[in-house]
Every structure is written in C-alpha cells, then in structure tokens.
C-alpha cells in the first residue's frame, strides 16, 4: 500500500478521527466540522496532532 492510516486529534474539540494520510478530498471533524486535512496532491496537509499511525501490512 502506498500510504498509511493515521489518527488525528482535532485542534478545536480534541476528537480523535482516523483518516488516510494521502487524503484526496477535504476531511472535516465528525463532531465540530473543523477541517483537519486538506489534499495537496501527495500527503495531505494535516491540521491537528497525529496521535497514531497504522503501519501498512
């Protein structure tokens, strides 16, 4: 696999959410709606703290 899944903590509400590190679309927090990832053509621009990385198998 060309990327990993990560767990990101929202900077506004501290909700933890899992997403693909190379997200192709904007990812918003499921609780407060704050944008936590923006696509850049490669790895996404992450807003918030990455708390865990799930390694590829």
Swiss-Prot record:
A single Gene Ontology MF term assigned here is: structural constituent of ribosome
What's the source species' lineage? Archaea, Methanobacteriati, Methanobacteriota, Stenosarchaea group, Halobacteria
Q: Summarize where Zn(2+) binds, as residue positions.
A: 10, 13, 29, 32
Q: What UniProt keywords apply to this chain's record, in alphabetical order?
A: Metal-binding, Ribonucleoprotein, Ribosomal protein, Zinc, Zinc-finger
Q: Show which residues constitute the signal peptide.
A: none
Q: What is this protein called?
A: Small ribosomal subunit protein eS27
- Which cofactors does it use? Zn(2+)
User: How is the quaternary structure described?
Assistant: Part of the 30S ribosomal subunit.
Keyword Magnesium on entry: no
* Family to which this protein belongs: Belongs to the eukaryotic ribosomal protein eS27 family.
For this entry, list what GO says about its biological process: translation
Q: For this protein, what does the record note about how its cofactor is bound?
A: Binds 1 zinc ion per subunit.
Q: Which InterPro entries match?
A: Ribosomal_eS27 (IPR000592), Ribosomal_eS27_Zn-bd_dom_sf (IPR023407), Ribosomal_zn-bd (IPR011332)
Keyword Ribosomal protein set for record: yes
Per the UniProt record, one Pfam family is Ribosomal_S27e
């Amino acid at each position: 696999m060309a990327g990993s899944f990560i767990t990101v903590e929202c900077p506004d509400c501290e909700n933890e959410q899992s997403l693909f590190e190379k997200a192709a679309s904007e990812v918003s927090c499921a609780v407060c709606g704050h944008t936590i990832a923006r696509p850049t053509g490669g790895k996404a621009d992450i807003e918030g703290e990455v708390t865990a990385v799930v390694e590829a198998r």
